Each structure stands twice: as structure tokens, then as C-alpha cells.
Amino acid sequence: MHRRTLLASAASLAVVTHVRSAAAETPGVTATEIKIGQTEAYSGPASAYGAIGFGLVAFFKRVNDQGGIAGRKINFISVDDGYSPPKAVEQTRRLVEQEGVAFMLNGLGTPSNTAVQKYLNQKKVPQLFVSSGADKWANPKEFPWTIGLQPSYRTEGQIYAKYILANKPDGKIAILYQNDDFGKDYLAGLRDVLGDKYDRMVVKAVSYEVTDPTIDSQAVTLQGSGADVLVTAATPKFAAQMIRKIYDLGWKPLHLLTDVSISVASVITPAGPERAVGLIAAAYGKDVSDPAFKDDPGMKEWRAFMKEYMPDADTTDANYVYAYSVGCVTLQMLKQCGDDFSRANILKQATNLQNLQLPTLLPGIVINTSPTNYHPIRQEQLQRWNGTRWELFGDVIEGAGS
């Protein structure tokens, strides 16, 4: 009797030990749930991007309604960081240490993601598909647990420089940039292509802080430089202000705008559609306002999703299209995990995406990653605002980055 009790206790201990060991290997994952964390700017100067978080909440609700992943429901915990790095650190630590998420997904912005990058890599928590085009997310040697998604700002700067050289070879360039890695990556990209012409062609570069109320004074300074080309590397609030201000000043440079601020709802409409005519931006996702995609199967899929899961949302807002793209990539990555949702395998699958086509990406643009290639999207196409919508022109261009 005593021997049986001892054996039973040993067996129970073995089961408990195995369960604890499995739980330790797959934090945030149980037999019924996969817990994912996100910090998002639902308030503050970049609150227009809050639509991305809302879009992902809806996307994962659909995933759950359709049965989840490998028999598990997604528990997506998205919290506000106000676009404040200290708040992002606080919220990220809470999600990792208290909520015990399996991985962090699509955190917003260069400053906030920079603030948590070392912490997440030290903890070996995947920091996946960062919502920022900073080049620093593609550094697998130093930060293997961090990977971006969209084309890097530096690559986009290179694309814009190529366009300027081809169309305004004698142009005088003025630049407005956010005073952080986001803005400085554009300067680096322009310099990559312009080379020794940079100092001659760039007649003025002026920065702004995310805490500035307006950029009106910067616009006046840039106009006074005599430039006939303007590159604006700014988030939506400041991009809209710039479009409006240069129109009011009567300044008409060739204006190139970062692709993070191409939303009709959060940039063009506040600025005034008529004020943005001729504006050029790069794109990798399909534009919801472009009639060319009215009958596109991918956009039909997106519209059906929006109608069912976000019926009251503004469907002219490109942030919802971006959110759907992020959701689709994450879904594919989770499917590739099979039944192994350890953090190591989650990272492995995120860095082994092959020729992935998404319903919301422009034709010809695909996603590829590898353990040495942390630039998932490296292609873009230019588009011009015609007063009512964005019009694509030219060929798909692949930038630098491997």
C-alpha cells in the first residue's frame, strides 16, 4: 500500500513537473489560448494610429470566430502608451511580467519601440512586425528578437532620392523631419543615393519634436530657403499641418511625403484634399479610395471584414488596411508554428516567411524574411494625389536592404 502511494505520488510529481516545464517553454500559451501583447498610441500626438490597434482587435476576433489557431483562441491585449516611451516601457513590462504574453506585436513608433527593444531581447520575447520603418529593426546580430514589417524609412528615402534625381536633377531640396530615428533615417536614405550631391542639393533641413504644437515656423523657414523640392518625414498630425501651411503660404514645391502619413482620413481630409494636389508618396498597400481596386478580390475580402467586424469605422482610413496586413502576416506565422508555440519557434517562423502575398498589398509586392533578412517588405510604388484619390504611377521599385 505504502509503495503504491509512493509510486502514485511520483507519477503525480512527474505530471506536474512536465506541465510546469511546458508552461515555462511556452509562456502565454495554454491548450486553449495564445496571449499576444501590444502597446498602441490610442492617445497623444500620434493617436491617429490607434485605428491600427482597433483593426487588430477586430481581426483576431474574426480569427477566434473561425476557430482560432491550432484549437487555441487569441487573447490580444492592446494597451495605450500615448506615444510616450516611458509609458511604453511601463506597459510592456506589465504585459510581459504580469500578463505573461507569448510575444509583443506591432508596437507603434520608433521612440517607444527603441525604449523596449533591449528589454525584450534580454528577456527573449519576440518583438514582431514593429509598426515603424526604422532600419534598426533589421539587426539580427544585435537584436535577433526584433523584426519590422513595412519598408524601412531609409529605403524610402533612397527611393525618393532616385525620383528627385530623375525628375529634378538640379532641384533644391528642403526637408522637414521628426527629430528621432524615424526622421533621421530619411536623411540617411537621401544621402545614400545623392552621395556627394547631398550638400549641394539639400539647402535646408529642419526638425520638429513630437511635443511641438505646430510646425508653422518650420514651414516658413523651409520656404525661405528657396527650395523647389520638399521632403516631409512627419507623422499624420504634422504632415497635415505641413500640407495646409505651404498651401496657405503659396509655396508650390515638388512635395514628397512619407508613406506613414498617406491616410486620407487622418492626413488628406484634415489638410484639405484640394491643398494636397500633386503630393507624391510611396505605397506598398492598396488604397481603399482607388477605383482600380473596386473589384479587386483582396479588397473585397477586406471590405467584407470591415462590414462585419468594424461597421462604424471610417473605411477611407489606410490604417485599417495596414492593420489587416499585420493580422494576415501574424496569422500565417502562427499557422507555420504547427503546435509548437515556444518563443523560439515563434521567432523562427516570423523569420522564415517565403514569397507571402497578402490581399492588401499592391500587385508585385511580396513578403520575404530569413534569419539574416529582417526586411519583410522591400518594394514600393509611387503615387500622386489628384484631388480626390491617390493615383499609382511608374513601376514597383525595390530598395536596398537584405
Label the predicted regions.
Residues 86-90, 135-138, 143-250, 292-297:
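Extracellular/periplasmic Venus flytrap/periplasmic-binding protein
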Residues 1-17:
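N-terminal secretory signal peptides and thylakoid transit peptides that target proteins
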Residues 48-54, 66-139, 149, 207-216, ...:
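Beta-alpha junction/loop-to-helix N-cap segments that form part of ligand/metal-binding clefts
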Residues 81, 128, 135-138, 210-211, ...:
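Venus flytrap/periplasmic-binding-protein-like
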Residues 23-36, 70-73, 165-170:
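Immediate post-signal peptide segment of exported/extracytoplasmic ligand-binding proteins
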Residues 246-322, 396-400:
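Extracellular/periplasmic periplasmic-binding protein-like sensory domains
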Residues 308-321, 331-390:
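Segments of small-molecule ligand-sensing domains
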